[in-house]
UniProtKB/Swiss-Prot annotation:
It is a multi-pass membrane protein. This is WAT1-related protein At1g70260. Keywords: Membrane, Transmembrane, Transmembrane helix. GO terms for biological process: negative regulation of defense response to bacterium; negative regulation of defense response to oomycetes; regulation of defense response to fungus. The chain crosses the membrane at residues 10-30, 41-61, 72-92, 106-126, 143-163, 191-211, 225-245, 259-278, 289-309, 312-332.
Amino acid sequence: MEVKVRRDELVPFVAMAIMEACTIALTIMAKTALTGGMSPFVFVVYTNAFGSILLLPFSFLFHRNERTEQSIFSWPLLVRVFFLGFTGIFMFQNLAFVGLRFSSPIVVCAMGLQIPSFSFLLSIILGRSKLDWRNTSTRAKLMGTIVSLSGAFVEELYKGPFIRPASSASPNRFLKSVPKLLVYYNLPDNWFLGCIFLAVAVFSVSLFNVVQTGTVKKYPHVMKVASFYSIVGTIQCLLFSLFMERDLSAWKIQPNFDLYLIIATGTFGSVIRTSVHVKCTQMKGPYYVPLFKPFGIFWATLFGTSFFVNSLHYGSVLGAAIAGVGYFTVSWGQLKESEEKQSSNEERKSIKTIHHRDEDEYKVPLLINQEESPV
């Protein structure tokens, strides 16, 4: 029994840590392809097209033993699917990869940690949340948002010196060859513009999360919903990319690094990572998977310092670390809020139960008296 408990704790942890490592590794590879001249818009179209082809049949296999009364082809759900594709695929991915082209993987990681803060601010703007200063969860989310945004400003405005300058590079031939194969950071860059693109991408995915939460409540087959909005988002990206990239040579992919990257990114992003996230959520709850997002800082720093020179700045790591602290603070506030709501609902149920019990105790003697009285 104890071994099973340990396994149930260890397997999701290791799986999520590996998912974050693979995400950063693919981000570095994408940076390499974009630096080599590949269009970010074409890359988004091809990866999502390939991923959608895999995800559609896989989603039906994933939910083959589940039934739902709600049809995915109802107008309310189709509108939601269109908006999910627009915000989560079209807006988010195009802006994110353009931002990556101008910055580096650790900047992408740090800006991605702003999602809970943006979601919190968005919920206030939309009237879904209220600022109750007496509430511990509200104070935690507000403080976490301030800290997280501070990390983003540090990331954007301060680079600092390189952690591993070329003069301190290892004489190891393998390490010297890695920067020639992969690119972590390149000059000239446009750090500020890259952060702006990434910030808008984060805002877009925050909108996506709001709509997705409501959609999953109406239609709980998560993988099917993901496959449909992936197809819709791919079509939107294709129409936009045909306008942006009118040179046919930009659409020609040779059987080289770019093609392998498209296949790997499409397979991992659409099927592998999504499946692992869904399974871990089912096993550990809705707040388990997001807690591993800051692991990307560790992997981005490890890869950047181990295999690349003149690539990772002290300011990048500092800003990402500050953003990570803010991320965990906001996440703790969200968890606290969820516990408070659950406790409040349980109290209401217990009060209703006591109220009904009192009514029953009051009604029973009357019924007895009625039965005993003559007709």
